[in-house]
Amino acid sequence: MSITHQPANLTLAQIQQMIGGVMLLSQHSPLHRRYVVAEWLQRILPAFELNQFCYYEDEHGRPIAFCNWAFVSEQIRDELLSGVREISPSDWRSGQQIYIPEMIAPFGHGREVVNDLRRRVFLPWQGQKVCTVRGKVDAQNDRCIRKVQWFSI
């Protein structure tokens, strides 16, 4: 499957508004509240540059979810899943494997986001496995527990 770049026709103001919405969503996620600016630059901004994201709002224009994806090589995917390293700008279009760096759905819309991605974004990849690393905050020990998750498109 060939990946073509389709830049979004978004204004700088629209992108800034969505980034602000992602920050608002992160306030409701124990994991994302812990991110530092460098992590946001690494894990969110490339998606806006490459139009590899979905941003969801409710009927009142309030943000409810965000998801982005990268097309990585098998080697990079395996390194990301093992925790050897984090995603870098050159990774986002390095292969054919779909990797989800971030899904922020703190109000319970995760399943709806996945179903939307299956129908609207990833239909050409139907049957392919997609992976992500979910984090859960262990506040008692002040650490994040990594959990690899796979699902089918």
From Swiss-Prot:
Function: Catalyzes fatty acylation of the protoxin (RtxA) at internal lysine residues, thereby converting it to the active toxin.
Reactions catalysed, as given in the entry: a fatty acyl-[ACP] + L-lysyl-[protein] = N(6)-(fatty acyl)-L-lysyl-[protein] + holo-[ACP] + H(+)
Pfam families recorded: HlyC
GO cellular component terms, A-Z: cytoplasm
Disruption phenotype: Cells lacking RtxC do not show reduced toxicity. However, the RtxA toxin displays reduced actin cross-linking activity.
Source species: Vibrio cholerae serotype O1 (strain ATCC 39315 / El Tor Inaba N16961)
Main location: cytoplasm
Single Gene Ontology BP annotation: toxin metabolic process
Catalytic residues of the enzyme: H32
Places the protein is found: Cytoplasm
A GO MF term: acyltransferase activity
Protein family per UniProt: Belongs to the RTX toxin acyltransferase family.
Keywords associated with the record: Acyltransferase, Cytolysis, Cytoplasm, Transferase
Gene encoding the protein: rtxC
Enzyme class of the recorded protein, top EC level: transferase
EC number: 2.3.1.-
Protein name per Swiss-Prot or TrEMBL: Lysine-acyltransferase RtxC
Record has Cytoplasm as a keyword: yes
